[in-house]
C-alpha cells in the first residue's frame, strides 16, 4: 500500500462525539505506524426551519428551529495493512456518519 491515502470524513450533529471519535481514529492510526493529517474541521452546515406557532391564524407569530451538521476530515498517509485492520475493528459511537475513500 505504498504512496496511498485513506481519506475519512466524519459527520455528526454533536461536535463532542465527533471529536471523540476523531481522536480514536488518530490514536489507532498512530499506534500502527501510519502518518496522520487532521482532524481538520470543515465548515458547519446549518439548516433552519421556520414554522407557525398557531395552527390557523397569527402569521406573525413564528418559531425557528435549527439543525447543525459538524464535519471533520482525516487523511491517513501510507497506511499499513495493520492500520487498515485496526480501523475496521474500531468501535465508534452510533451518532457519527463515516465516509471512507481510498
UniProtKB/Swiss-Prot annotation:
Part of the 30S ribosomal subunit. Disulfide bonds: none annotated. It comes from Lactobacillus delbrueckii subsp. bulgaricus (strain ATCC 11842 / DSM 20081 / BCRC 10696 / JCM 1002 / NBRC 13953 / NCIMB 11778 / NCTC 12712 / WDCM 00102 / Lb 14). This is Small ribosomal subunit protein uS10. It comes from the Bacteria. Pfam families: Ribosomal_S10. Belongs to the universal ribosomal protein uS10 family. InterPro entries: Ribosomal_uS10, Ribosomal_uS10_CS, Ribosomal_uS10_dom, Ribosomal_uS10_dom_sf. One of its GO terms (molecular function) is tRNA binding. The keyword Acetylation does not apply. One of its GO terms (biological process) is translation. Keywords: Ribonucleoprotein, Ribosomal protein. The keyword Ribonucleoprotein applies. Involved in the binding of tRNA to the ribosomes. One of its GO terms (cellular component) is ribosome.
